């Protein structure tokens, strides 16, 4: 399959984006943790001040999925700021359906993300990869990615909504 197109997502792609988010979550054994809705995606990504940006990989009709989907991959990203090095592109989610891997779709998405990062004068792209996900780790390392967990000793933390509410209410 030589034909596919990488393009910015539109509001009409939200159902496909959610479908792929759920497929990625299933791949990562976290399917039950997706609570996001299509409405959330629409409001959060396509309003006046979008919280995220998204690229999608689209194949022509002769390569649609058996279920009739033309969108077979996506990358969700946003911009953040590091006070030491400046602007960063943060890659939140990146997924290509298993039947469509090995055709250069993932590489082309990453190329497009790199072009976006350079156009916006970002100093780097950051992302997380599950420790067990060797195929993805190798995919990124082949393209020059560094593992900051092992090289710099950073640890990822989160504060859940319950605790955010508690701290926000403190007097």
From Swiss-Prot:
Residues involved in substrate binding: 27-28, 92, 126-128, 152
Keyword Transferase tagged: yes
Ranges of residues in domain N-acetyltransferase: 4-170
Keyword presence, Cytoplasm: yes
Active site: 140 (proton donor)
Compartments where found: Cytoplasm, Cytosol
Catalytic activity: an alkane-alpha,omega-diamine + acetyl-CoA = an N-acetylalkane-alpha,omega-diamine + CoA + H(+); spermidine + acetyl-CoA = N(1)-acetylspermidine + CoA + H(+); spermine + acetyl-CoA = N(1)-acetylspermine + CoA + H(+)
Keywords from the named record: Acyltransferase, Cytoplasm, Transferase
Superkingdom of the source species: Eukaryota
Pathway annotation from the record: Amine and polyamine degradation; putrescine degradation; N-acetylputrescine from putrescine: step 1/1
Cysteine pairings via disulfide bonds: none
Cellular component terms per the entry's GO annotation: cytosol
UniProt-listed GO biological process terms: polyamine biosynthetic process; putrescine catabolic process; spermidine acetylation
GO molecular function terms attached to this record: diamine N-acetyltransferase activity; N-acetyltransferase activity; spermidine binding
Binding site for acetyl-CoA: 94-96, 102-107, 133-136, 140-143
E.C. designation(s): 2.3.1.57
Gene3D superfamilies, alphabetized: 3.40.630.30
Known role: Enzyme which catalyzes the acetylation of polyamines. Substrate specificity: norspermidine = spermidine >> spermine > N(1)-acetylspermine. This highly regulated enzyme allows a fine attenuation of the intracellular concentration of polyamines. Also involved in the regulation of polyamine transport out of cells. Also acts on 1,3-diaminopropane and 1,5-diaminopentane.
Subunit (UniProt): Homodimer.
Similarity section: Belongs to the acetyltransferase family.
Protein's name in the database: Diamine acetyltransferase 1
């Amino acid at each position: 399959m030589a034909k596919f197109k990488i393009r910015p997502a539109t509001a009409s792609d939200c159902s496909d984006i959610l479908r792929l988010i759920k497929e990625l979550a299933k791949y990562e054994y976290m399917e039950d943790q997706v609570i996001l809705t299509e409405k959330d995606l629409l409001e959060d990504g396509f309003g006046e001040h979008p919280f995220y940006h998204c690229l999608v990989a689209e194949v022509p009709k002769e390569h649609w999925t058996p279920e009739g989907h033309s969108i077979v991959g996506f990358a969700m990203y946003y911009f953040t700021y590091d006070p030491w090095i400046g602007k960063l592109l943060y890659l939140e989610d990146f997924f290509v359906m298993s039947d469509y891997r090995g055709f250069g779709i993932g590489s082309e998405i990453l190329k497009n993300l790199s072009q976006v990062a350079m156009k916006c004068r970002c100093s780097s792209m950051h992302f997380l990869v599950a420790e067990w996900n060797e195929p993805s780790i190798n995919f990124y390392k082949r393209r020059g990615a560094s593992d900051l967990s092992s090289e710099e000793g950073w640890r990822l933390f989160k504060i859940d909504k319950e605790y955010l509410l508690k701290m926000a209410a403190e007097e």
